[in-house]
Amino acid sequence: MSITPAKKSELISEYKVKDGDTGSAYVQCAILSERIRNLTEHLKIHKKDFHCRRGLMVLVCKRRKGLQYVRNKYGNDAYLDLVKRLGIRDVFH
């Protein structure tokens, strides 16, 4: 359900804005998206794992707030680009 350090560093290198960037909104949204994908796969197998389902909802809300931050701070084009790169739905349009 968690992501491996190798996968995390791969996501950081793919979504970083500059060298040494590990905590920008882009990177955080990418890491949250990967964790959400892992939990979704887990819940397909374990349908009655309600504690995990609640954790998934918390992560989805955190990612939505991060995407909203990107949209407000960097503009709609940067937001749409990030959504496209992550392969998720646009939640604000």
UniProtKB/Swiss-Prot annotation:
SUPFAM superfamilies: S15/NS1 RNA-binding domain (SSF47060). It comes from the Bacteria. The lineage of its organism: Bacteria, Pseudomonadati, Pseudomonadota, Alphaproteobacteria, Rickettsiales. This is Small ribosomal subunit protein uS15. One of the primary rRNA binding proteins, it binds directly to 16S rRNA where it helps nucleate assembly of the platform of the 30S subunit by binding and bridging several RNA helices of the 16S rRNA. Forms an intersubunit bridge (bridge B4) with the 23S rRNA of the 50S subunit in the ribosome. SMART domains: Ribosomal_S15. Part of the 30S ribosomal subunit. Forms a bridge to the 50S subunit in the 70S ribosome, contacting the 23S rRNA. Keywords: Ribonucleoprotein, Ribosomal protein, RNA-binding, rRNA-binding. Belongs to the universal ribosomal protein uS15 family. One of its GO terms (cellular component) is cytosolic small ribosomal subunit. Pfam families: Ribosomal_S15. GO terms for molecular function: rRNA binding; structural constituent of ribosome. One of its GO terms (biological process) is translation.
